[in-house]
């Protein structure tokens, strides 16, 4: 087995860079790709075409980096393309699959006599068909690489729209047979990649104040870095450190006063010129913000609504308290009414009792008067009786004395 290797030229190195983005092409054919018996018996016309094929192969070898494996006079059975280098295998050559030059990521084309399109080429031999297919494939690859390189150079010189692509008329010598959309695809530019990538909102926290910010990935950032390191902090912490120390010192000991603010177009470098310590400036700044920058601020509206809700809750609580007080006053009023009714009943009873007592007193007084009259009568009668008794007693005593004296 002989190998013919040409040195890499600048064009081949460009082909090497461009070929890294190409996809793998697999044309599956039977594993045993052996030339038929008709290919061994070549006619004079096939010999001439064979010589023309050799000259074309020599021209291609001079134009691009091509390695020929096997006997160049044998028919082309396989073709490998890897990292800008084309490997053409002629004849029956046993190649190990573990060969690093021919890994699974190579572009592989297997050719044998069964691939001949007899409808398009009814009279062509398998050798001529193999030569035509190989030359056509190599030409298409070379032309496509040239077009990709031209488009890349034009984009570097004068950037065009992402949908730009050169077009040629069908009769133009630069016309390429259309392939599938993902075949020989050129690498996308950075603008195309940014447009194709979906925007993703990511929550990132500061390592100093642990405040969480929500930014769009690869679009904007709320963090800044110094010009000497890539450790990011939030803008509030950067300003706080600058106000305290007049210079920013990162935890990696990088010291700088300048900072960089990033977005999808690049970065802006800021340098603090003057540090003025005035506590009233932030108050004035916030007064201006609240007057001019809170018209369409959803957070302010939410805060206002929340404040109104708090006031409404307080008013509801006060209303509940007033209702409770009114309920208590109503209950007290009802109790007082009940007490008043009871007092009136007590007064009526007292009046009734007083009337009854007065009546009883009058009755007792009349009874006492009657008894007094009876007593007076009895006293008079008793006095009269006593006087009568005394008189009778005196008469009896006198009579007794008289009787006694007579004895």
Curated annotation (Swiss-Prot):
UniProt record, GO biological process: symbiont-mediated perturbation of host ubiquitin-like protein modification
SUPFAM superfamilies: RING/U-box
One cellular component term from this protein's GO annotations in UniProt: host cell nucleus
PROSITE patterns: ZF_RING_1, ZF_RING_2
Molecular function terms from GO: transferase activity; zinc ion binding
Keywords (A to Z) from UniProt: Coiled coil, Early protein, Host nucleus, Host-virus interaction, Metal-binding, Modulation of host ubiquitin pathway by viral E3 ligase, Modulation of host ubiquitin pathway by virus, Transferase, Ubl conjugation, Ubl conjugation pathway, Zinc, Zinc-finger
Entry-linked InterPro entries: Znf_C3HC4_RING-type, Znf_RING, Znf_RING/FYVE/PHD, Znf_RING_CS
Primary location recorded for the protein, binned into one broad class: host cell
Pfam families: zf-C3HC4
Lineage: superkingdom: Viruses
ZnF RING-type span: 206-254
Function: RING-finger E3 ubiquitin ligase that plays an important regulatory role during the initial stages of infection. Migrates to specific nuclear foci early in infection supposely to prepare the sites for viral replication by targeting and ubiquitinating host proteins.
Subunit structure: Homooligomer.
Name of the protein in question: E3 ubiquitin-protein ligase IE2
Protein's organism: Rachiplusia ou multiple nucleopolyhedrovirus (strain R1)
Gene label: IE2
